[in-house]
Amino acid sequence: DNAKAVLTYCFFIILSGSVANLLLDVDKFMLNFYINIDNIAFYSVAIFIATVIAVPSRAMHQITYPITAKLMSENKHDELNELYKKSSITLQVIGGLILVGILVNINELYSVLPEGYSEGIAVVFLIGISKYFDLVLGNNNSIIFNSKYYRAVLFLGLFLVFLTVSLNMIFIPLYGLNGAAIATLISITLYSLSKLLFVVLKMELFPFTKNTIVA
């Protein structure tokens, strides 16, 4: 029974990771059908710049994942809730500083790139906002992955893929590169809200405090 449970868990985690990787390329794949292929390079560079905002969360998750697992196995709800809040406010501050740093220096950054790449400036802003919103949720993923509701991540991820593809079909023909970024912003925001509500309603954990507004 234990072996079956472990294999089932690994299966869902691997599938969830595959969905996440798919999302990294779905925009660029769909742009091929609507705009000049040369412009996709502008989008790729903009995505790369905006993704820098998510770097702190990767380091944070490496630290909080085992701590989260330990607290959940010991049913220490209050300590887990405190960790959730601390991870949220920490990533909010660090991610916010990185986002502001990128946006303040975006024109200088694009001045060293070949002409035409500046078309991706709005993409950097839109994707940056979506990454930042995801950061503010702290160790949300760690909590869901270590709970009995870990299957929910896969289903939410599939919902995100469907939503992203649908929104891309609407916004890319209207706004080109910016349309793909708008679709991603809406999709990630709704996905993040879904995870937030899931953790709040199912596990009674909440990442925000009065310091969230101050920060």
Predicted regions and their residues:
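Alpha-helical transmembrane segments of polytopic membrane transporters and translocases
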Residues: 12, 27-31, 41-61, 89-90, ...
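Interfacial transmembrane-helix starts/ends
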Residues: 7, 44, 68, 76-105, ...
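Interhelical loop/hinge segments that connect adjacent transmembrane helices in multipass membrane
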Residues: 1-24, 63, 67-82, 202-214
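C-terminal transmembrane helix end/exit motif
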Residues: 1, 139-143, 185-215
